[in-house]
A protein has these predicted regions:
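Switch/communication elements of ASCE P-loop NTPase nucleotide-binding domains
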Residues: 108-211
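Phosphate-coordinating catalytic segments in nucleotide- and nucleic-acid-processing enzymes
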Residues: 1-143, 211
Length: 211
């Protein structure tokens, strides 16, 4: 199915010209998709959803959606055997696990018996912790789609190879992944790993005389 959208810098919100929208929605309405913004948001999630619903603040829906996805309750669940090695590798980097306090409406990093508020943790660690959370709670399962804007932003370059491995393993497990990046190193790691762990397509977007 092809979805055609025409817009420019003067197009107002929701006023873009769209073709084949109805058939697109019909075919993909049941598809589970997740968008991870370049800016980490869980550290600022306290009462954000309720405030947004009451129009006290205005946030892009993608931020609200990722908070909803991260809040999925996993307390009663157990790690699937296939996920365990991946989760363990991520836990070694973040040195703990993600914990959501439903009563306080806050995310924490849990280190053994102690916990630290999410906003006190380095942003790069928080981004990796979010990936751990989405894998743990079943958001990223076979048949789902992940969109991630600049996954390398604020992450220690030493951890980039592991992030690439994680994403390629998710792809092998049936998760379709779209990444936007300006980082050559991240792209090169995908290029190197592609022959080993799956197929990756690269698309370069650039300006022309026509826009």
């Amino acid at each position: 199915k092809t979805l055609i959208i025409n817009f420019n810098t003067k197009t107002k919100k929701w006023d873009a010209e769209v073709k084949n929208e109805q058939s697109w929605e019909k075919d993909f309405s049941d598809l589970e998709s997740t968008f991870i913004p370049a800016k980490e948001i869980l550290s600022n999630s306290f009462n954000l959803i309720s405030a947004n619903e009451k129009s006290n603040v205005e946030f892009d829906d993608t931020y609200i959606d990722i908070i909803h996805s991260a809040k999925v309750d996993i307390s009663a669940g157990r790690d699937a055997l296939s996920k365990k090695p991946q989760l363990n590798r991520l836990e070694k980097i973040i040195e703990g696990k993600v914990y959501f306090d439903n009563k306080k409406d806050k995310f924490y990093m849990k280190y053994g018996s102690s916990k630290v508020e999410f906003n006190l943790v380095a942003e790069g660690i928080r981004k990796i912790a979010l990936l751990w959370q989405l894998m743990k709670n079943g958001t990223l399962e076979k048949g789902s789609v992940l969109f991630w804007d600049e996954p390398e932003a604020n992450i220690n370059p030493l951890h980039i190879p592991l992030i690439v491995d994680m994403l390629l393993e998710l792809q092998q497990g049936g998760v379709q992944i779209f990444i936007s990046t300006h980082d050559y190193i991240l792209s090169k790691y995908f290029d190197i790993k592609t022959s080993e762990k799956g197929m990756v397509e690269f698309h370069s977007l650039y300006k022309t005389d026509n826009g």
